[in-house]
């Protein structure tokens, strides 16, 4: 029964993503110190990735700790936990936080950017636009049903997966402390 439910959820996500037109962008980055003014403007350009372009962000041998959160504007539990993630990131600048929007690329200018501004989201946002959800969900975690919010926390030694929302800042902090 659980397998049928998981397959139904994956199929539903696949259908949703099949409706999205695939776009691409260059995946280039450089290390630099970010000023507070740049932090405010971090989401002026939101990159749109397919999974092959996105995958290097979640599989890195860096010494950093990463928090990658999959979310969407239409997901109430996702929106509820965004302030906790934002607060955590402000208090822990050594942790690389990336918010992965699963919204439609056509909504970036008209809905996503205004939403981020209204909610004072200053963490890096990327948009994942890949119709083959059945393939990429399993690559992220074979146990992930595809439901959001979904968060990956990792460093070069360990990976933790959370298919639930964080209840508050303390909940988020307690989970990331579990990394070696």
Label each region the model flagged:
Residues 70-87:
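Conserved redox-active cysteine motifs that mediate thiol-disulfide chemistry
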Residues 64-66, 71-74, 104:
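Short pre-active-site segment immediately N-terminal to redox-active cysteine/selenocysteine motifs
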Residues 26-28:
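Bacterial signal peptide processing site
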Residues 115-148, 156:
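Short, internal strand/loop/helix patches
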Residues 148-180:
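Thiol-/selenol-based redox modules, centered on thioredoxin-like
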Residues 82-119, 133-138:
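Structural microenvironment flanking redox-active thiols in thiol-disulfide oxidoreductases
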Residues 21-24:
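C-terminal motif of bacterial Sec signal peptides marking the signal peptidase cleavage site
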Residues 45-66:
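A short beta-strand-turn-helix
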């Amino acid at each position: 029964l659980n397998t049928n439910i998981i397959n139904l959820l994956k199929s539903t996500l696949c259908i949703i993503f099949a409706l999205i037109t695939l776009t691409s962008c260059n995946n280039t980055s450089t290390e630099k110190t970010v000023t507070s003014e740049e932090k405010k403007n971090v989401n002026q350009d939101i990159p749109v990735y397919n999974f092959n372009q996105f995958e290097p962000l979640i599989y890195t041998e860096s010494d950093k700790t990463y928090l990658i959160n999959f979310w969407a504007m239409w997901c109430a539990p996702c929106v509820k936990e965004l302030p906790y993630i934002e607060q955590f990131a402000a208090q822990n600048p050594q942790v690389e936080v990336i918010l992965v929007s699963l919204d439609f690329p056509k909504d970036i200018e008209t809905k996503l950017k205004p939403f981020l501004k209204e909610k004072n989201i200053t963490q890096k946002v990327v948009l994942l636009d890949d119709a083959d959800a059945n393939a990429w969900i399993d690559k992220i975690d074979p146990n992930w049903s595809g439901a959001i919010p979904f968060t990956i926390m990792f460093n070069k030694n360990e990976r933790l997966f959370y298919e639930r929302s964080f209840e508050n800042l303390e909940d988020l902090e307690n989970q990331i402390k579990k990394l070696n």
